[in-house]
Amino acid sequence: MCVFDEFNVQRVINCSGKMTYLGSSILSDKVRKAMDEAGTSYVQMEELMDRAGEVIADYCRSEAACVCAGASAGIIISVAAAITGGDERLVEEVPYVSVKRKKIIIACAHQIDFGAPIRQMIALGGGEMVSVGTVNRCYPWHYEKAIDADTAAILYVKSHHAVQTDQVALADVITLAHKHQLPLILDAAAEEDITKYIEMGCDLVIYSGAKALEGPTSGLIAGRKTLIQACRKQSKGVARAMKVGKENIFGLLAAIKQYGSHSSAMQRQIVDAIVEELKSVKGLTVSVAKDHAGREIYRAKLEVDETVCGMNALMLDQQLRNGSPIIYTRNHNANLGILLLDPRPMQLSDTAIVCQRIKEILAVSL
């Protein structure tokens, strides 16, 4: 009996993406093997953390790196590192640090909720959030005006959750931060390029280990050596509650080692198969859509005409979730009549099942 049956947990066909609430990723054989082997022995955790940092830094082309429990933990730790500088007295004070220099500047459009509000991560790291600009507009002078002697860092977010309209480009914010001798912390949780942002000049870059990298629940921080050392010091303070087990560290190393070996051809094959299968369904307009945040991700886009289908996109999405098998779509724009099917977490065999289920639901409603 498999664990899903043993504990009565339903499997899901994930057409939504690398979502935490759906378990983020499916692990490869190599990652599972690394985790299994890690679970058979004891290890000196400090040595493992050192070696993991060296390996990750090599792949990210950064001065140094460290493992963390996830991208949200990475934000907390990075903020704490920028504020404390690794001073052990201050490390023990986080999040209630007794210094004035703890302001973290972030654009209003980047104050996202990824399942928890980013402002809470800043606060847990001891930071005092300073918001600049408005939701749909931010200029360099907004940042300039906010910087003062009590500013510890600037936090920038690369995410599909963030508003993309009329924001200051990352390259310009990096230049601005360095002009004022401030570290630029980048939340790149689900980003796919693990070298680009270090090469651009970001001081700390945070990635999820379980999203694009397809590793176990984990995260990593890459960047300047002095700041990474300060990040590591947080394990004596707030990061103690966010420690990572040896199994997940080895799993992350296996994932990053094989990263980039996955072919995008299979993903495009899935998208094309969905478009071909559903293009003749009345009331659906089906096409291929590129990721709106600019990543090289292509998804099947379903536009639901309620007057023809007898239901809107929200209703279709709900029926897919409530059916058997359970199917999750990428429903961020369901209120606008749009559902996306993301091929990255899908198996080719899922395609026929998902398309058939959509046809069945719409056939009943017509």
Over which residues does each language-model region extend?
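A structural motif shared across PLP-dependent enzymes of the aminotransferase-like
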Residues: 20-31, 42-49
